[in-house]
Regions:
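Alpha/beta-hydrolase active-site loop
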Residues: 94, 163-187
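Short, solvent-exposed turn/loop segments enriched in Gly/Ser/Thr/Pro and often Arg
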Residues: 145-147, 198-202
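Sec-dependent signal peptide recognition
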Residues: 2-9
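Alpha/beta-hydrolase fold nucleophile elbow
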Residues: 111, 189-200
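Surface-exposed acidic, glycine-flexible loop patches that form ligand/cofactor-binding
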Residues: 101-108, 183-191
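Non-catalytic accessory segments of hydrolases
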Residues: 19-168
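Active-site loop->helix "elbow" adjoining a glycine-rich segment at hydrolase catalytic centers
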Residues: 118, 169-173, 201-202
Length: 202
């Protein structure tokens, strides 16, 4: 019995504590919870960083997320953006990002890596980031509009735009995601003043 108590005490003192991040996290738009990936990594998948770019918001600058009430469970990635080389679930409603963190609380100040996937602006989607989080960094992977949905410019679209221009919606999605990081990443234990952008191909 004494041996069992010793084993339990050793386990308790050597187990990572995620009391802070296991509770709902308050973002600008509302509260969320994530899921444990093991090895002390927490994942928050499918977080909206802009309103769905559909209907009147198609071929427009990304717009702020509409706030929600209650707590959303973020344990599944959002759909991939529309593309030709893909057999996964796709949708125009695709402006979601994912966060992997090994922080033990929101008071931590871990470096943040923002991954922008490749694919020549035409295909692919977000990657998994648990390996980065397991090595002391927070990884954010981002979806963005591609093909005609991300880059098409046309005089008629420019006339409808508040800024008088059209095109480059995919890059504007990148900027919206980075603004989201600046506003929210500290809630995941990240340092908003230590953010690195990286990627490949695109």
């Amino acid at each position: 019995m004494n041996n069992l108590r010793i084993i339990l005490l050793v386990f308790a003192f050597n187990s990572p504590v995620f009391a802070d991040l296991e509770q709902p996290i308050q973002l600008d738009a509302g509260q969320i919870t994530g899921t444990s990936m093991g090895s002390g990594v927490q994942a928050f998948l499918g977080i909206p960083f802009a309103s769905p770019p559909v209907g009147d918001l198609r071929w427009r600058e990304p717009q702020p997320v509409i706030p929600w009430s209650g707590v959303k469970v973020m344990d599944r990635k959002g759909p991939d953006c529309m593309q030709s080389r893909n057999t996964n679930l796709m949708s125009e409603d695709c402006l979601y990002l994912n966060v992997w963190t090994g922080a033990q609380s929101s008071a931590d100040k871990l470096p943040v890596l923002v991954w922008i996937h490749g694919g020549g602006w035409r295909f692919k989607a977000t990657y998994d980031g648990d390996a980065f989080a397991d090595n002391g960094a927070i990884l954010v992977s981002v979806n963005y509009r591609m093909n005609a949905f991300g880059w098409m410019a046309h005089p008629a679209l420019s006339e409808e735009s508040e800024n008088g221009v059209s095109g480059n919606y995919g890059v504007l999605d990148h900027l919206a995601a980075l603004e989201w990081v600046q506003s929210n990443i500290e809630q995941f234990g990240g340092d908003k003043d230590n953010v690195t952008i990286f990627g490949e191909s695109a």
